[in-house]
Amino acid sequence: MPRKALKPKEKRGLPEPDSKFGSVQIARFISKLNFEGKKSIAESIMYGSFDIIKERTGEDPVSVFNRALENIRPLLEVRPRRVGGATYQVPMEVPVIRSTTLAINWLIGIARSKTGKPMREKLAQEIIDASKKEGAAVKKREDTHKMAEANKAFAHYRW
């Protein structure tokens, strides 16, 4: 149990908008990208990938980033539910904040798993692919939706 009182729910979770673009989504992405407390490196990776996105697509990188997140965000996911000794994978709708967090985690995880290029290039390529509804992150979303569809029979166990 915390010794200090927790902040109200409205004030928890969402960071201040980032300094360059004024976007809360980008600030959340930078916070997730943060590695070993080195936020300045995470910011340089993010802004560097935005420069690459602008160079390759000729579009506003923030709109490409937001479109990529929209294309990756899952609408359904399966959650384990134990009923009478058996565990069922129950499909459930995903709240907006969780779906955005999942999308951010998937983008970063996939970019980190690739090898051979600097992180800003891998991240930029993954964001561009996701904005075109291509790439591994979109495939991950489709797999999540397929899993929910396959377990639709257990939807009545929803709580």
From Swiss-Prot:
Q: Name one GO cellular component term.
A: small ribosomal subunit
Q: Which InterPro entries match?
A: Ribosomal_uS7, Ribosomal_uS7_bac/org-type, Ribosomal_uS7_dom, Ribosomal_uS7_dom_sf
Q: Which UniProt keywords apply?
A: Ribonucleoprotein, Ribosomal protein, RNA-binding, rRNA-binding, tRNA-binding
| Lineage top rank: taxon | Bacteria
Which intervals of the chain form a coiled coil? none
- Record-level GO BP terms: translation
- Identify the CDD domains for this entry: uS7_Bacteria (cd14869)
A GO molecular function held by the record: structural constituent of ribosome
Instruction: Please name the PANTHER family in this protein's record.
Output: RIBOSOMAL PROTEIN S7
- Give the family from UniProt: Belongs to the universal ribosomal protein uS7 family.
Q: What is its quaternary makeup?
A: Part of the 30S ribosomal subunit. Contacts proteins S9 and S11.
Query: NCBIfam families per the record?
Result: rpsG_bact
Which purpose does this protein serve, as stated in its record? One of the primary rRNA binding proteins, it binds directly to 16S rRNA where it nucleates assembly of the head domain of the 30S subunit. Is located at the subunit interface close to the decoding center, probably blocks exit of the E-site tRNA.
Instruction: List the protein's name.
Output: Small ribosomal subunit protein uS7
Organism, scientific name:
Endomicrobium trichonymphae
This protein's gene is called rpsG
